[in-house]
Amino acid sequence: MARVGVLLLNLGGPERIKDVGPFLYNLFSDPEIIRLPVRAFQKPLAWLISLLRSSKSQEAYRSIGGGSPLRRITEQQARELQSYLRNIGIDATTYVAMRYWHPFTESAVADMKADGVSEVVVLPLYPHFSISTSGSSFRELKRLKDSDDEFAELSIRCIRSWFDHPAYVSSMAELIKKQILACDLPQESHVFFTAHGVPKSYVEEAGDPYQDQIQNCSLLIIDQLENSLGFTNSFSLAYQSRVGPEEWLKPYTEEVLEKLGKSGVKELVVVPISFVSEHIETLQEIDIEYKEIAQKNGIVNFKRVPALDIYPLFIEGLADLVSSCLNGEGISLEEASKLPERVKLYPQEKWQWGWNNSSEVWNGRVAMIVFLCFLMELIIGGGPLHQIGLL
């Protein structure tokens, strides 16, 4: 009988203040996060960004207790999922693979091989696919498979996205409903979805399906919420966590909060739609930064829907995804790691320079300008990057 391993993919996060710099370096070394036309620029640029952003990021992590809870919560999710699977007759062992911090993907692969796993289900803890999240993790796993004959012999099936899974949609609707009913005027509360943003070029030029999946997911949740409540709440969607001067998906969360406040919204239910675990974006960015913006603009009652964490229906949904994958609904790792044809990442074909609409050309030129700005600011201790919020 095959030994089943369920590999949960997630971002990772620094558990201690001293981990912040190395974590940022790992993050920005990934070409799916910052796409450059020349590979040699990647690690020097990552080093500079991590050096210059460490202080600000450390301050943010101090405000939530000194480190990210993401590993602890993800491991709780893994234990709950393993227990649920075994209770329904699936003898599986769960493993956690973080992309940019411990436990790294290599460690999870080594553990699966040591345990004698022969069949692997790869489940990203990102409901919505993006080339910069699930795509990067799948691609890293594919790299390990290509370089490890023993790992390559395993049967590997993947779940690419699951934003429309009924249990996920229902879990979100249930948690939102609780916050709406806790408002003084439930029918007048505004439901505000905020998702992690990505550069606009990823969607418009690289063909990333992320924005479409976020929008469709929001509508599915709203439909279920209306059926459950029996009344309709106004709602909106925005994107957070923008970094650097490049245009990201709009509207931006902080700008929508200002508009909602000025339009007279007093009760706001904030939904972190792309996050299934509490971490820096929910605990610091939403709970502290965005709450302050909302209150400054007249929003009196700011309620934030908790992340799913180990919500029972959510765990049940993850188990159903695993079960379906084992029954043939998953896709191969090769298919899961395949990027849209318009995306160029390392290893790349010979680069063609020229004045055209390729996002990589422009990203490369911008990267060189930013690189020079970094060097200048290292010397003078200030400059334009402070003004645009990168430092």
From Swiss-Prot:
Localization terms from the record: Cytoplasm
Binding site for Fe cation: H196, E281
Reaction catalysis annotation: heme b + 2 H(+) = protoporphyrin IX + Fe(2+)
Keyword Zinc-finger: no
Pfam families recorded: Ferrochelatase (PF00762)
PROSITE patterns: FERROCHELATASE
Recorded superkingdom: Bacteria
Enzyme Commission code: 4.98.1.1
Enzyme class per UniProt: lyase
InterPro entries xrefs: Ferrochelatase, Ferrochelatase_AS, Ferrochelatase_C, Ferrochelatase_N
Gene Ontology biological-process annotations: heme biosynthetic process
Keyword annotations of the record: Cytoplasm, Heme biosynthesis, Iron, Lyase, Metal-binding, Porphyrin biosynthesis
GO CC terms, sorted: cytoplasm
Pathway: Porphyrin-containing compound metabolism; protoheme biosynthesis; protoheme from protoporphyrin-IX: step 1/1
MF terms (GO), sorted A to Z: ferrochelatase activity; metal ion binding
UniProt family annotation: Belongs to the ferrochelatase family.
Protein name per Swiss-Prot or TrEMBL: Ferrochelatase
